[in-house]
Amino acid sequence: GLEDCDFGWSPYDQHCYQAFNEQKTWDEAEKFCRAQENGAHLASIESNGEADFVSWLISQKDELADEDYVWIGLRAQNKEQQCSSEWSDGSSVSYENLIDLHTKKCGALEKLTGFRKWVNYYCEQMHAFVCKLLPY
């Protein structure tokens, strides 16, 4: 329930989420999430409902209005094989929502699609990001 998420975090389906308006590389963002109180991760997205929620969360945050990309926890382990991608929190990639891979290996949500579709982007680029944690 709501009472399980700390101030600043928003609940959805037994997890808590927060979009951060700090410019970080994918690795820095994942480290930042892990440093949060309960050891969060960059957000994994495992259903259409969760994708809608994360998109809504980003759009609610005025400081993110100028962001073109927002990091999520997807990272390709190997350029050629999408099937070896995984979420940074260890969730398996059973729900798929990608546009393309190329040689960009870190997952982001793209403003052009209303932060609704995943794109693979250059991991060293600096972007805002969304963390996700289990509240207990």
From Swiss-Prot:
GO biological process: regulation of cytokine activity
Subcellular localization, as worded in the UniProt entry: Secreted
InterPro entries: C-type_lectin-like (IPR001304), C-type_lectin-like/link_sf (IPR016186), C-type_lectin/snaclec_domain (IPR050111), C-type_lectin_CS (IPR018378), CTDL_fold (IPR016187)
UniProt keyword terms in alphabetical order: Disulfide bond, Hemostasis impairing toxin, Metal-binding, Platelet aggregation activating toxin, Secreted, Toxin
Domain of life where this protein originates: Eukaryota
Similarity comment: family membership: Belongs to the snaclec family.
Function: Elicits platelet aggregation by the binding to the C-type lectin domain family 1 member B (CLEC1B/CLEC2). Binding leads to tyrosine phosphorylation in the cytoplasmic tail of CLEC1B, which promotes the binding of spleen tyrosine kinase (Syk), subsequent activation of PLC-gamma-2, and platelet activation and aggregation. Binding to GPIbalpha (GP1BA) and alpha-2/beta-1 (ITGA2/ITGB1) may also induce aggregation, but this is controversial.
Cysteine disulfide links: C5-C16, C33-C131, C106-C123
An example molecular function term from Gene Ontology annotations: metal ion binding
Secretion signal, residue range per the UniProt entry: none
Expressing tissues: Expressed by the venom gland.
Organism (species): Calloselasma rhodostoma
Quaternary structure note: Dimer (non-covalently linked) of heterodimers of subunits alpha and beta (disulfide-linked).
UniProt protein name: Snaclec rhodocytin subunit alpha
GO cellular component, one term: extracellular region
Name of one Pfam family that matches: Lectin_C
Record-annotated C-type lectin domain positions: 12-132
SMART domains: CLECT (SM00034)
